[in-house]
A protein has these predicted regions:
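Charged, amphipathic alpha-helical segments and their flanking helix caps
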Residues: 1-27, 42-133
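A short, hydrophobic beta-strand-centered structural micro-motif
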Residues: 32-43
Length: 133
């Protein structure tokens, strides 16, 4: 069975660019001009797969946060979508990324209220393993 914390750390390492694993991210980016990339272990769904086997769907969210203007948004949207596509079919920590979802792609509220781009892509990794119980 895959450890979701190790998976999140592997995703952050693969992204590079200062990406960091956090468990309760909340940012006010006043005075911060550089982009922040945050990786959060988001959930695990387990179901029976085949006789004596289980399928885990491990979900990791990648957030890009940056103080910006509306003119910066298209490039930031392309970047968050690109992160998701880059992980599809990629193996990290022994599991394969089977899905990347941006829904919504970014938070219009954060853009209006904070002048901050907050975009999230949720990566779903699949693991099939023997039920050891």
């Amino acid at each position: 069975m895959v450890d979701i914390i190790e998976l999140a750390e592997g995703v952050a390492a693969e992204i590079g660019d200062g990406a960091e694993v956090m468990f309760a991210p909340e940012f006010d980016l006043k005075g911060i001009k550089e982009k922040r990339i945050v990786v959060v272990p988001a959930g695990i769904e387990t179901k029976p797969s085949a006789r004596d086997y289980l399928e885990d769907r491990l979900k990791v969210q990648v957030g890009i946060l940056k103080k910006c203007t509306e003119d910066d948004v298209p490039a930031l949207i392309r970047e968050i979508v690109s992160v998701g596509r880059r992980f599809l079919h990629k193996w990290v920590a022994g599991v394969r990324c089977a899905k990347a979802e941006c829904n919504p792609i970014y938070s219009p509220e954060h853009l209006r209220e904070r002048r901050q781009f907050t975009g999230v892509v949720e990566l779903t990794f699949l693991s099939v393993h023997r039920n050891e119980e």
